[in-house]
Regions:
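C-terminal reverse transcriptase regions that engage the nucleic-acid substrate
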Residues: 1-89, 165
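Mobile genetic element proteins and their domesticated derivatives, centered on retroelements
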Residues: 6, 13, 30, 49, ...
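Alpha-helical recognition domains of nuclear gene-regulatory proteins
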Residues: 12, 28-31, 51-52, 75, ...
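Short glycine-rich loop/turn motifs
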Residues: 46, 90, 101-105
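A short, polar/acidic, helix/strand-boundary loop motif
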Residues: 57, 110-139, 164-171
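Two-metal-ion RNase H-like nuclease active-site motif
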Residues: 89-97
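Short acidic, Gly/Ser-rich segments with clustered Asp/Glu that frequently serve as metal-coordination loops
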Residues: 97-101, 167
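RNase H catalytic domain
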Residues: 142-197
Length: 197
């Protein structure tokens, strides 16, 4: 039981021919984006295809685009069945940030096992890529708190991250600027942080 992809849409994705122009790429990414919550790291996988659709880009289909195209198709064909969210079980939010993107997995603990509710990801802007690792990790946490707010607000949940420097935020006396606003957002939620080793 849970939420699954529509077999007809997945078949349409799996049979999609290699794009021959920007319009084809946009159409494919648009259809694939409909199921982005089923694909871990969707934004990072799709980034080469998105780059082809920018106004400043020339359409030249290369190996990196073919790999991204095939990886997205494979990810959608093998997409997991997601658990239906409820407020009866504890949520776990795993976040991570790399140099180019951030991602999250929202899970629910059901019968002692974590079951995926949804995946989410986002490519960093040019400015955000210049942030230090701690700031990128904090941005990921805040972004996905907002993204999954309808599930997390009002519930106690666990946030797992691999960046232990984030523990400073709870002890920060008077944060200012951007970090202060992010921390203010986080204070709306009831959570504990766990660190992956």
């Amino acid at each position: 039981e849970g939420i699954a992809t529509d077999p007809q849409k997945v078949q349409a994705v799996s049979e999609w021919p290699v794009p021959e122009c920007v319009r084809d790429v946009r159409a494919f990414v648009g259809l694939a984006s409909y199921y982005r919550k089923f694909v871990k790291g969707f934004a990072e996988i799709a980034a080469p295809l998105h780059n082809l659709t920018k106004k400043s880009a020339r359409f030249t289909w290369q190996e990196e685009h073919q790999r991204a195209f095939e990886r997205l198709k494979e990810a959608l064909v093998t997409a997991p069945v997601l658990v239906t969210p409820d407020n009866e079980h504890e949520y776990v939010l795993d976040t991570d940030a790399s140099e180019h993107s951030m991602g999250a997995v929202l899970s629910m603990v059901v019968d002692g096992q974590e079951r995926v509710v949804a995946y989410a990801s986002k490519v960093f802007t040019k400015c955000q890529r210049n942030y230090c690792v701690t700031r990128r990790e904090l941005l990921a946490v805040v972004t996905f708190f907002r993204h999954f707010k309808q599930y997390l607000l009002g519930s106690h949940f666990v946030v797992r991250t691999d960046h232990s420097a984030l523990q400073w935020f709870k002890r920060s006396k008077e944060p200012i600027g951007q970090a202060g606003r992010w921390i203010e957002t986080m204070e709306e939620f009831d959570f504990e942080i766990q660190f992956r080793a």
